[in-house]
Amino acid sequence: MNQDTICALATADGVGAIGIIRVSGQDALAVVNRIFEGKNLEKVPTHTVHYGFIKDQEEIIDEVMVSVFHAPRTFTAENSVEISFHGSPHIAKKILEALLKNGARTAKAGEFTMRAFMNGRIDLSQAESIADLIASENEASRKAALEQLKGGISKEIAVLRGDLLNFTSLIELELDFAEEDVEFADRSALMGLIANLKTKLGSLIDSFQYGNAVKNGINVAIIGKPNAGKSTLLNALLKEERAIVSDIAGTTRDTIEEVLHIKGTAFRFIDTAGIRETSDTIEEIGVKKAKEKIASAKVLLYLYDEQDSGVEEIISFIKEFYRPDLKVMLLHNKIDQNKGVSAENISEIDQALKRELVPDYTDTILGISARENINIELLKAELSSFVETLKGSENAVVITNQRHYEALRKSLDSVERVEEAVVSGIHTELLAYELRTALEHLGEISGEFTNDEVLENIFSKFCIGK
């Protein structure tokens, strides 16, 4: 690990009441002391704050408060200093220049957090959670990132690795005594361990569906024929005139995307062009983009009304785009204009759709009026309930990181191959190889098994001061 003393602005760029510059490294106290007029920072106790001035030679740059932290009780586990100054970008630039002149260098993106990881202060999953916490935009993503930072995933992985390691050691011991044909690892006990691992790994893998939704939001595609009321629905959900509304079919030519937070979860609503056969080149491009958005959606809101082409066309459309992981909600729009239709979905078209589509393709048919805001809050409640169905038990660990998800999948694959090998009575050497592989994939999550390229990719996504 590089022992250079590094420095960077820790607060956001721009003017503010207070700015903070972080300094970390073996010589951090000495470097800052060279430009600080006040107490001798190399002699003050750890976790103390001191008033004084930052100087560049004889020129006073600013009046500051300096916080001193001695290794190893710091974020990076190195000597660290934080300089709080009046939040002018010009002052920040001058202080950083003074630090560079006196032995520090500019930190790379994520280098403070990388040092915390390399010095054993946090593991790799906790390091990634810091970036997630900074990027969190809603309550659900904040809580998930904080739980990961507190070590929720780390503890779960440590237990799994501990169980695997015990058996791997016994299997490898058998290899050492291969000529004596001794069996150290009880195969029935190994099968019990495998069953337990499969359950735990499967639970973590399944949690990614909810975790990914929490972290990145849920894509909701609003679809239907031209003039079905899709743009009106988007405006009703957002409570603002975001999309152009017109009686002319085909008004929306491109997709419009807006994020709405419902009970702490971000829903990304996508108003698509009405899907129909058309000779209009621009509208045709819009229809193509709409179909692409449907492919990436987690929820499909299909709008129709009594003037629609009928049940068969709606059913055909839903079946064309349906996927097992897609939540489909049929919204019978404009119920304010049709006396025979109610919020209880008693119309003939609704009953036919229920017979044909429920429960194989959808479990929700709801009567609404986007124009009159009828049942819009009920629609939001349905969306929120859908998120709850993705959630496991209240205290279960949730996977939010794609890298962790892929490592868990690979580990489960290896565990399943171990199971096959035990059942088939395959040679101990293959068992040992697959057990080691499963261990390594779990170790990728915590950072025990990784490489410089992976680390560089992870930490390069951080901001400079973190």
Where are these regions (language model features)?
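Glycine-rich, N-terminal phosphate-binding loop of Rossmann-like dinucleotide-binding domains
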Residues: 87, 237, 272, 304-307, ...
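Short, Asp-centered acidic motifs that coordinate Mg2+ and/or phosphate
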Residues: 267, 299, 329
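A glycine-rich (often HGG/GG-containing) alpha/beta subdomain
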Residues: 1-143, 147, 151, 322, ...
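Switch I (G2) and immediately adjacent beta-strands of P-loop GTPase domains
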Residues: 51-70, 250-278, 296
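C-terminal-of-GTPase-core extension/linker across diverse P-loop GTPases
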Residues: 2-9, 13, 52, 142-261, ...
